[in-house]
Amino acid sequence: MSEPVSHSRRRALQLLSGVPMLPLASSLAGLPLLAEARPMMGAAVRYQFNAMPAPSLANPSQMAETYVASTLTKSIGRHSETYALGYETFFLTGDTVPSAEGGSILAGGYFDINNAPIADTTSPDQRQFFSDCPDGMSLIALGHGHARSRRRDCERVFAVVQFEYVTRNVAGDSMYGMLPSPIAVLALDQDKRTGKLTLESYSNVDTSGVHGLWITCGASRSPWNTHLSSEEYEPDAVTIAGNAQFKAFSQNLYGNPDAANPYHYGHLPEVTVNPNGTGSIKKHYCMGRISHELVQVMPDERTVLMGDDTTNGGLFMFVADRKRDLSAGTLYVGKWTQTSGVGAGAGDISWVKLGHATSDEIKALADTLTAADIVDVKTSNPNDASYTKIAYNGKAQWVKFMPGMEKAAAFLETHRYAAYKGASMAFTKMEGTTVNAADKRAYSAMSYIYKSMVDGSTDIKVQGPVAGAVYEHVLTGGQKDSDGDRIHSEWVSVSMSAPAALVGEDLAVRDALGNSANADKIANPDNLKYSEAMRTLFIGEDSGNHVNNFLWAYNVDTKELSRILSCPAGAESTGLHAVDDVNGFSYIMSNFQHPGDWESPLHDKVKSVLDPLVKANYNGRFSAAVGYLTIEGCTRHDD
């Protein structure tokens, strides 16, 4: 029988006793199994997300907002409860919110090296720039006694959220990569009864001590409760003199187009939250200067698997010298030995050692060296045997590294040096990374499978699809690197392959809405997060092949893939974070960025209808939402 259970307000999912739960945008735990439905001790709890259909022009408003019509079923034995899911925001970027320092502050606002607001001079009112692209987010609880809410019925928790870029200024000109990325700490009140999160204050993190931040994309929470950020698309120091984007970045950050140093960007920032709702930041310079999308720290608290969001990218791994300390360690890059070229393909992974370093010593090199001190690069064949041909960002180059500069090359010219050392620099837009610790599996999102993965120019040659796939890694210990030395980790990837349900499907002809990839399968996966409690992999899209980008849930036991959220048309799914237990509640955090970023022909059939709706919802397309999933209601089932 089924019995509806009504609730007068949104509630979060509450954990059963002793069962940790995934970070759902609003805790998925506020509705425990009814007492009479609880089974005997030891019975397994099962979770299944139930899919919703994609929105369509039959109801245009659903295509122009964050739309959720999915459900979650929680079962024990013969008893189950199904929860309707919804979405709630903390704010839209551009909102005025309470500041942790007193007064108010602009959410997603941009600041220069002196922490002064950066004004959009094309705006009639010279308004402060604010981002339409919130991205990586971490939910952090400091524990009882460290931070207290002023409300007796609430606990104090925090979120760290970063803002990747500004799509355009008021005049409509592109601002991509021209502003220093802000990052903020949100102080949140967590209702002890429902798990509801309410924004109490916002604090912009002072990044002047790390030379500002460059294009912060995905993020993860470390096992020691810090926020691990990113700096993707590292500026090429070899060609920096002609890089207008970087000069604009430097002008906006320093007030001088030549002040910024490219070797200060492309590293891993780490944010520590303070009990007063502020944050402090440092950069780790010893983890490779690559297109950091996000990293995943393994349960040993030393091994870090890293995505590399570029063409001719690599699979990188860092093994820290000490637990919970990323300031020193050994950097490796993967070598793919193909075992299948069918579809997304499969390969065995071995590891090339690039070097060992501390962050301080690489920072000192970054402060003093130029590209010419490290490497000479030719873009046409010099017919000189002292140069080595490599693939770099989709093109052939010939490189010669300066004598004695191996360490600088490994950690500041990482892409070129990894290719020189024989690594498989062929992956295309390897983005999100996460771990399934119980099964010793990791997952990597290959947003697009094309170019250097399919053209035969490297040691990887697979078929596709362009719509991408999520690869599963087998993790183990007892491995040796290319020098024959032991890798001191039990969490080393030794193979990669894509589960059938996690491979996109290209369409030969666009469908009636304009999709060029099957809308009922993933397309161009980006954000990944895994819930140990729910045994569910969450997948957010960054797709130029779906009219609306989706958030998916994949049950690793049933192999069922379910669409659980749709972003506004033209937006991508970002800020994904799954947390199994925050004071007895679980959360799935989810943002989106650049709503109404119309592409042709993808949006040709919907733009005229949806553009006015998106503009009305999101401040003329200048704003985007930061938020989380919620429980809307519950139905009980007894067999």
Regions found by a protein language model. Give the residues of each.
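N-terminal secretory signal peptides
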Residues: 1-27, 34
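Conserved small-residue
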Residues: 22-25, 34, 38-639
